[in-house]
Amino acid sequence: MEKQAHKKFCWIIKNFSPQSERLYSVPVLIGDCKWRPIAYPIRDKYFSLCLQVVDFESLPCGWGRYVELRLTLRNQHNSLNLSIKADHCFDEKRTTWGIPIPERIPICKLQTELYQSEHVVKGDFKIIAEVDVFEAVGTLTESDISGKASELLTKKIRNDGNESGDLLKKTSPEKESNHVDVNGFQVLPSQVEYVRSIFERHPDIAVEFRAKNQHLRTSCMIFLLSLIETLCQSLEELSNEDLVEADIALTYVKDAGFKVDWLEKKLDQVKDKKEREQSGLARLHELEEYLLKLKQKCSNLDLLVEKENVELSATRTPMSFNDVV
């Protein structure tokens, strides 16, 4: 991919609140097309961002753009300073992208940050965007796996450290003598039970799968299994970065032709559980700090009571004969 353009701009958002509708920035020309970020509340609770290609209808058939994005969310008082770095592939089917924020920002917290200074207009803040746009050569085909998907797949296989690490070196079914065919997909013996279970529960999953090349079919199936394995991890092991990669993986398997609406719902459930876990951890941390302060206060009170007892005892001590005379 050849770098097409670089742009840095600032979007000032005014009067943002939980009741706000979608807020659109003025379109910004970057390369040969116009882009705009979109801000909106989710269920009146969370702050969310999107990036959209505005004039995609004027672009040639088969267009594609790869975007690297760096965002900084900041208020005038600088008490709010959040940085986001992400990337995404845009094409005719994907003209709007929900930017993955590492942690969902509760609007109540956002408003607290925005409103805490008397010198800042309520609900006003700015988003500083730095965008690099690359022209993508073609879109996903049978012989072209997207760079990001390939990178994640290779990383996943390397991290697993199992026998499927040699899979990418194999180019034909004849060389895959240790593989088993399941519904037209060559998989390892250890994966057969899982793949069969997927087809039993979701028989139409590969109805629209387009790839004929066996190497690509196998790679896509490994990618699907890796995504499912990610969702099976415990929340303690699952990071926000893992969920961002899971979003990318889901987009990839959908573009390859797998019907995975059921998996998308499961991913949303895991995201929701992760958010609840993080909120619970935050509340637990606050309670622990509060309890620690209470214990310190109790300790201080114990010392004060002990001191008062000593002083009271001294006060109650009767005077001796010598003291009186």
From Swiss-Prot:
The keyword Coiled coil applies. InterPro entries: MATH-CC_domain_protein, MATH/TRAF_dom, TRAF-like. Residues 258-306 form a coiled coil. Transmembrane segments: none annotated. Keywords: Coiled coil. The keyword DNA-binding does not apply. Residues 6-131 form the MATH domain. This is MATH domain and coiled-coil domain-containing protein At3g58430.
